Every structure is written in C-alpha cells, then in structure tokens.
C-alpha cells in the first residue's frame, strides 16, 4: 500500500497543474485569438503574393524557353515538326528578331474568376447595372406614370445596321481573295516575262483591295449618314482587315522574294489564311495551338456578357451624360462650366473604359477563340496593376500591341539600327494615335483631335517619363488618376461637340469650318 501513496500524490499534483494550466490557457486564449486571426490573414496574403509572383515568373520563364527553342530549332539540320511552308521558314531566317510565340493559355480574368474575392467585384458591377435599371424604371414611373424600359439610344446607335452588314460582305471577300491571289502570283517561278506580268497584276490586285477597304466604308457611312454603332462595325472591320492582310503578306512575301534560281515556292494553304481572318489575333501563322473541344455554354456566356455591357453603356450615357451635355452648348461658355463638366465625366468615362475592355477584349475575343478552338487567350495582361504608362500601353491590348511591336517597332529597328529605338517607338505612337483618331472621326462623323493630342502628346510624354523604373503603389495611383482625367476630358469634349453640331448646323460649311470645333462658337 505504501508504494501507492507517492503515485497518488503525483496524480494530485498533476491534476492541480492541469487545472491551473486550463485556467491560464482560458485567460490567454482570448488574448491570443486576435493575434492568431491577424497572423492567419497575414500568411494568407503572403501566400497569395507568392503564388502570383511565382505564376508570373514561371509564365515568363516558359515563354522565354519556348521562344528560344523555336529560334534555335531551325538552325539545326532537322525538319520542323509542323508543316510550315518554305516562305515561312525563309521569313524566320531573314528576320531573326523576337517573334510572337503562341501557346495555349487562358485569359487572365478567367483565371481570376476562380477567386471568390474577385468574383464578388464582378457581382458588384452586375448589382450596379440592376440599380441603374431600377432607377430608370422609378424615374419613368414618377415622371410619366409607366413602367417600361426604353432603348431609344441603343436603337438610334444601331440604326441601318443591315446596310453596314451588307457592306461587310465585299470588304471580307476583298480581303479573302485579293491578297492570297497576289501571293500566288508572286510565288510563281521567275522565268521570262510571265513572272513580271504576274507580279504587276498582283500589285493591281493589292491596290484594288486597298481601295475597297479604304473607300467603300467611308462612302457608305457619309452617303447614308450611318449612326455611330453601325459606323463602328464598318471601321473596326476595315482596320482589322487591313492589319490582317498586311500581316499575312508581311510574314510570307519576304521568303518568296529570297528564293534563288527562278524556282517557285509553296504558298500557305488557303484554309490557314481563312482561319486567320476569323481567329482573334493579328499575327499570321500557318498553325496555332488549338483546344480539344468547344464549350458552347462558355460561348453563350461571353456573348451574353458582351450584350450586358452594351446595355450598361447605354444606361450610363442616357442617365449620366445626355442630361448634362444635351443643353450645355445653349449656355454661355465659361471655364468653370468646362472644368466641372470634365470632372463630372470622369466617372462615366472610366466606366465606359472598363466596359469596352471587358466586352471586347475579354468577352468578344474569348467567344470567337472558343468557337474556333484558338488556344492562346492572352488578349490582355494585368494592365490595372501598371505603375507606368509604358507598361499600360503594352498590357492593355496585347492583340494590337503584338502587331505594332512586330511590324512597326521591330521593322523600324531593322531599318534604322539599334540607335533608332527612339524613332521606332515614336513611330509606334504616331501610327497608333493616327488610327485611334481616324476611328473616332469615322464613328462620330466630325474631326476633333482630342484623342490625337491625348494619345500622341500627353501619352507620349507619360510613356517616356513614367517608365518601368517607377514601381510602388503611388505610381499605380498616379496612373489611375491620369486615366480618370483623360477619360473625363474625352467624354466631356466629344459630347459637347456632338450636341453643338446638332444645335448649330452649317448649311454649306467650308473646309476650315469642318475641321474647326463647333462647340467653341455654338451658342444659340
């Protein structure tokens, strides 16, 4: 019995220690709980940052590795695994600069939609559309006693759409047949005068192609006074066809003219060119990475989202812009009114920018990519995280940036040498600014170089001053501030000019009256 006494005493002491420990733990648990929550949140944030950084670095590493492999492979004495034509291989040998490499990858927003926090932001935008619809119904019910949505602005913008779609057919046929036939004529064996005659005929076909694309849309839109949205269809297809046909010839013609010995060369297949005209890229390749199947529910979802963005934009213009700017030209001009109108337009302007980005660069391009099983969905990158305008211009629209980089910047370096980097970059800005201004002039029906000045002058200065050396959240805030102000200036000035030309029409305007802003002198 005696040996059990020490054991009993030890058990009693252990019980007391456990009770004291439990009491102490209960006292400290309430103090440690907030620290544990904060520490958990901190670790989750660190984990998210590490994963995002690792994903970006891995993607860049893989892109670089694939590009280096593609560049190094033709130098070996082995045939390419793809069925690339002789002209494509000759082009790669002639221009050893960095070429666009297509790989299978998702769009960034599709990846971010898998994160619940980002999906909530998407839901907030949908809730904003619902609020606009409710407010429109409430205002119409209070003012006019009816509960019905009117889409007058939408119907006006898309007026005469069938005519615009009819004009698309000859534009498409011209792009489909004439450049490809020109390439076939130039690829014939160079023997005697037959090749010279064929080459001359090819130049005539290209001139006819350029005339159809440049003259027909302008003539139809001016003669029939097409509204803005119908003009958008024509001008975007006009620019797209010109850029695609140029890329097709630019990628194939150099290899053809470098063939020696008077031999002919195998031209790309017609099916590859036809696929290129519809796939969402402006860089021609004979083959692209393809997905295994088509998700038709994904296609329908993207088209529905694009339609929702269109309705969203109409509600924003109808509720936030039209009431403000419709009668502004009837009032005397003042700097105060102009400044207030610009600041008022910053909100609608940035909303329009985001809607255009999401509707076109994400929904529309992804829908066509899915229908055509086009694998490379990197139509944009994380431009919203940019801390410099140079990075913003590179990541906002990757589709157009790739074309400008390949055929304006790199060709400029090839012609001017490495010392001409500044001139090549200036050429990129000049081409982009002129095309943007042409699109605005075509759609709105008047010349008002707001976009030209903002893009070429202000954007060019910001590109060279706010470069990639600047990092940190302050620079991102500054970039967004300039975006807000720039969008406010565009929306305000273009809306004022639109209504001024309707309030103060000129019966027989001269050339200078056509190019002079009417909002500067219209005060009926």
From Swiss-Prot:
Q: Where is the signal peptide?
A: none
GO terms for cellular component? brush border; endoplasmic reticulum; endoplasmic reticulum membrane; membrane
Compartment(s) of residence: Endoplasmic reticulum membrane
The lineage's top-level taxon is Eukaryota
- Which keywords describe this protein according to UniProt? Acyltransferase, Cholesterol metabolism, Endoplasmic reticulum, Lipid metabolism, Membrane, Oxidation, Steroid metabolism, Sterol metabolism, Thioester bond, Transferase, Transmembrane, Transmembrane helix, Ubl conjugation
Where, per the database record, does this protein carry Cysteine sulfenic acid (-SOH)? 279
- Residues binding an acyl-CoA are 391, 394, 397, 401, 409, 432
Q: Is Acyltransferase tagged as a keyword?
A: yes
Q: Which residues lie on this side of the membrane: Cytoplasmic?
A: 1-118, 187-198, 255-295, 372-419, 467-472
What Gene Ontology terms for biological process does this UniProt record contain?
A: cholesterol efflux; cholesterol homeostasis; cholesterol metabolic process; cholesterol storage; response to nutrient; very-low-density lipoprotein particle assembly
| EC number(s) reported in the record | 2.3.1.26
How does it sit in the bilayer?
Answer: Multi-pass membrane protein
Q: What is its main location?
A: endoplasmic reticulum
Task: Kindly state the positions of the motif FYXDWWN motif in this protein.
Answer: 379-385
Enzyme kind, highest EC tier: transferase
Single annotated GO MF: cholesterol O-acyltransferase activity
PANTHER family attached here? STEROL O-ACYLTRANSFERASE (PTHR10408), STEROL O-ACYLTRANSFERASE 2 (PTHR10408:SF10)
- Kindly state the subunit structure of this protein: May form homo- or heterodimers. Interacts with INSIG1; the interaction is direct and promotes association with AMFR/gp78.
- By what name is this protein known? Sterol O-acyltransferase 2
Provenance organism: Rattus norvegicus (Rat)
- Supply the source organism's classification: Eukaryota, Metazoa, Chordata, Craniata, Vertebrata
